[in-house]
Each structure stands twice: as structure tokens, then as C-alpha cells.
């Protein structure tokens, strides 16, 4: 597949995952039984992990193809995304927190970490949607 097609496919995959993630926030959690609420919250964080992975990989491909920079890690990809002017410093800081929190969630289950990360999920959702908008506007043709 040509690079532009590969990039569009990665962005589309990210968009689809992010749409599913966003849908999990459309319901009033107070209406559900605590067991159901817990299951939904776990699903939200699982989709958060998946979306954050797709996000940085799409960013890495963009940076490689358009800016001729080869980030070695998720943090490097986000740093170069910022250095190339795609995002502002506030978005950069939030994206670094997204990566840190994704790592916390994927390595151990700890209820305190779960609660801490969940408290930031609204802010993360906003920035992840901002990144999608940026990725959709950029072409690597």
C-alpha cells in the first residue's frame, strides 16, 4: 500500500476506535447499577488504552512521512508532533500524560491508579479528538 493510503487507513482506524470510545460517554452513569457502572468505566479505560496506541502510531507515521523524522518511541512521536507545530504546549502536556497513564494501566491493575487515570479521562478525550481533527486535515501525498 502506498504511504498516503497507509496513513489514511491508520487515521481511519483511529477515528473508528475513537468514535466507539466517545459513545461510551453518551450515557448518564447515575442511571446504572454500580456493577454496570463499573463495567462501563472499565470499558472506557480499555478503549482509552486502545485509542492512545492507535493515536501515537498514526502520529509516528505522519512524522516519518511528512517530516522525515523517525521517532523511536511514543513519547518521541508526540514530542516531534509538538516540535513540528501540529499541537500546542497544553495539548503536548496532555498527550504525554495520556502515554504515561496508558502505561500505568497496562502494566498493573491498582484501583487507586484506575481512579486517578479515570479522573483525567474527560480531558484526554478532548485532546484525542483534537488530534484526530489534525490528523484528518494533514495530507502526506
What annotation goes with each model-predicted range?
Residues 1-141:
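Solvent-exposed interaction patches of small proteins and small membrane subunits
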Amino acid at each position: 500500500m502506498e504511504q498516503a493510503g497507509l496513513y489514511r487507513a491508520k487515521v481511519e482506524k483511529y477515528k473508528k476506535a475513537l468514535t466507539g470510545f466517545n459513545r461510551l460517554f453518551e450515557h448518564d452513569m447515575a442511571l446504572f447499577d454500580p456493577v454496570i457502572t463499573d463495567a462501563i468505566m472499565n470499558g472506557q479505560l480499555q478503549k482509552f488504552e486502545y485509542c492512545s496506541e492507535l493515536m501515537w502510531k498514526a502520529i509516528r507515521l505522519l512524522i516519518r512521512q511528512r517530516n522525515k523524522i523517525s521517532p523511536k518511541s511514543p513519547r518521541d512521536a508526540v514530542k516531534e508532533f509538538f516540535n513540528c507545530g501540529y499541537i500546542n504546549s497544553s495539548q503536548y502536556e496532555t498527550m504525554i500524560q495520556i502515554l504515561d497513564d496508558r502505561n500505568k494501566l497496562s502494566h498493573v491493575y491498582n484501583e487507586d491508579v484506575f481512579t486517578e487515570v479515570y479522573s483525567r479521562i474527560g480531558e484526554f478525550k478532548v485532546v484525542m479528538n483534537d488530534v484526530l481533527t489534525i490528523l484528518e486535515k494533514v495530507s502526506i501525498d
